[in-house]
Structure formats: C-alpha cells, structure tokens
A protein has these predicted regions:
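Catalytic donor-sugar/metal-binding loop of nucleotide-sugar-dependent glycosyltransferases
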Residues: 74, 95-98, 108-125
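Cell-envelope/extracellular polymer assembly enzymes that use nucleotide-activated donors
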Residues: 105
C-alpha cells in the first residue's frame, strides 16, 4: 500500500489532462520541505491559465467558505485533484478517506485531524477528456450534497488541537 515505508510522499493528479506535470515540484516541494503534510495545486493563487466556468467558480468559493467555517482553514481551490501528501497524511487517508466528495472532504478531515494543509500556485489547462462530475443542471443539488457531507463530517470528526490524530 502507499502508506508503507516504501513511499515517503505521494502525488495525485486527475486523469483529465487539466494538471500539467511541469508544476509537479511546485506541489511536491512544500511537502518535501516539511511545510505541509498535504499540498494542493491551486489555479486560484496566481489566477493564470484556465480558471473554470463562472458557475463552477461560484460553487468552489461556496465550498471554500464552508471549509473555512467548519474548520478554520482557508483553501482557495478545494476541488483540485492535484495534490501531494507525506507518509503520515497518506497513512491517515488510508483509514479515513471520503469516497463521495473526496477533495473537499479530505481537506476538512486532514485539517480537523491536525495535519498541515496548504496550497501552491499552478497553471491548469482545460479538461482534455472525460466528463465533470458537476453538471450545470445538477450544480445546486451537488452543492447541497457536498455542503451536507461537510457538515456531517465536521460533526463526526473530533478536532485535534496542536497535533495529529
């Protein structure tokens, strides 16, 4: 498993072509340096490259606000699937990773468990293939479901102060 000692750091990239491997070290370096346990590649820090549709940006902002409200952590690109983790974070996720809305729920769970979560600027491209799980006519329903999942997660995860779970 990725949580074994063989793999000290892990990288996740979506398979839809949005994530440019040229930015891999921007995402990995803060984990290598011990700054973060999980570093997320964010398209919204520099606001360059593909920024996604207006409605999706509104939804991402909403979820970002929910996460900040529920755990006090500010993350701009809460739906980014471009992330790096260290061994401790990966071991935690091996036991506690959400399957419904993994990107935003993982941020909330990691933050509540006392892990250091941060972002690094990347430039993303438009989706090269596949279909988004968020469709325009289902966006409101999706936002309600994710918001409720985050609230339920917050109620079920005990916040760790000054340490890791």
């Amino acid at each position: 498993s990725a949580a074994s000692d063989v793999y000290k750091r892990q990288v996740q990239m979506d398979g839809d072509g949005q994530h440019d491997p040229a930015y891999l070290m921007e995402v990995v370096q803060p984990v290598l340096d011990g700054v973060y346990d999980m570093c997320i590649g964010s398209r919204f820090i520099k606001k360059e490259g593909f920024q996604t549709s207006f409605m999706r940006r509104v939804g991402i902002r909403w979820l970002s606000g929910m996460i900040r409200l529920l755990c006090g952590k500010r993350v701009l690109d809460v739906t980014s699937g471009f992330r790096a983790t260290n061994l401790a974070m990966t071991a935690y996720f091996a036991q506690h990773y959400a399957t419904d809305y993994p990107e935003p729920e993982a941020i909330l769970a990691a933050s509540l468990a006392g892990f250091r979560v941060g972002e690094a600027p990347v430039i993303m491209r438009e989706r090269q293939g596949g279909v988004s799980s968020i469709h325009s006519f289902k966006s409101a329903y999706y936002m309600i479901k994710v918001s409720l999942a985050l609230i339920i997660d917050r109620l079920s995860i005990r916040k760790v102060k000054g340490g890791r779970a």
